[in-house]
Amino acid sequence: MGCSSSALNKAGDDNRLRSATEESESCFVQPKPRALGRESTLCGKVQKESLPPLDKLKISAVSTANGVQSLPEQPLAKEAADPPGATEETQPLQGLKGSEPPQPGGKDGAPGAEGKEEDVEAVTEAPPLKGSAETEPLGAEAENQPLITAGERDSTGAVEGTEDPQAAGEMTPLGTAERVPLEAAREPGSQEAGGKGEQSQLPETVPKETESPEILEGSQPVETAEPPQLQETVGENEQSQPLETVPKENASLEVSDGSQSVGAEGKKQLQETLGENEQSQLRETILGEHGGPEVSDGSQSVGAEEEKRLQEMLGKDEQPQLRETIPREHGGPEMSDASQSVETAVKADSLHKAPEGPGNMEKIQPERTVESMEHPAGILETGAKVEMARKIHTNEEDQHIEGETGETVETEMESEKVSEGAETKEEETGEAMDLSAATQIGMDGRVKGHSML
């Protein structure tokens, strides 16, 4: 009450403003428990006094923010829509002016209806501070709404319902609303066009990228297909080269074989010619010496048969050598007798058979020698075994004889001792002792045993 009485006693608007600011500061600073209505009245007074210039600023700001000065309908609509708030704001001022004289007298008592109205007004106007503070970040147009709805938001729900479309109408002027949607529509169109252009560019670029890999991939298969072709061609060339070389080798082999065959044939012809010459020489010599043509013919037939046999027995490689050796052996014109030619043929046969003969002889001889070496040893062993068996039989006969006389046990013990002693001696000296000697020792032992007994 002290704050309200000091504010009401002052006169003039300036004094009221100063006192209201001071009292508001004192109200905020002093944390004294007071009624909410009284404190709100002071704050409400301060806000009431400050709201009218804000309304003027609101109108000017809205007009400048919209940018449309040729539309007088909007402020008229605002004024037409503002009367509820304006009446609410002007009524408290009138109430304050009318209630200023009687308040000093009525403050001591209970507060009147005007105090209640002030409380209601303060309650209705105090929250808009928060609302305005909350809606300030929305921009210049958003700041205009809390100024309009500052005193009207909490008063009635119907007023809020009417103010929202007005605020929407004030916030979005017709010119700007038409321009902005058009521009917005144009911008999405441009964006869509840009998107289409980008999409068209992207398909163009994508096909290029996709085509270029395809082309590259296509070129790569071509390139990769070419190396296999090259490889195939190289392989064909290589195959052709081996084929060519193989025929060459085969041809050379065939040529070599042919040359060998030709050489063999030539050698055969030479041999035949040599044979004919030799045979003619032999015939001449035989005719000159013996004068019997039959013998010469027989020797020739025998020599021809032996040569055929030699050729059949010999291999291709051995034929030229033997043919060379045979003409050398037969080439001497000194060989006159058919017997000599037969002997040379027999020698040649022995030469051809010699590679097999000596090996067989060697194989046969070692076997015989081994057998001859083994058989004497076996004979000696068998002889020794027979002698041992005979001696054992004699020992058994002696034991049987002794068994009849009742002295078998001692002889058996002595024979075991003798055998063990012989074994120990063999182990020590490493020389095998004859069983005959052991038996003799056993006999001596038995004799000694008999003597001891």
Curated annotation (Swiss-Prot):
Q: Where is the signal peptide?
A: none
Stretches of Acidic residues bias are at 404-413
Q: List keywords of the entry alphabetically.
A: Phosphoprotein
Enumerate the residue ranges of region (Disordered).
1-38, 66-377, 394-453
- Does the keyword field hold Phosphoprotein? yes
Q: Which InterPro entries match?
A: Glu-rich_5
- In this chain, composition skew of type Basic and acidic residues spans 11-21, 305-332, 364-374, 394-403, 414-424
Protein's name in the database: Glutamate-rich protein 5
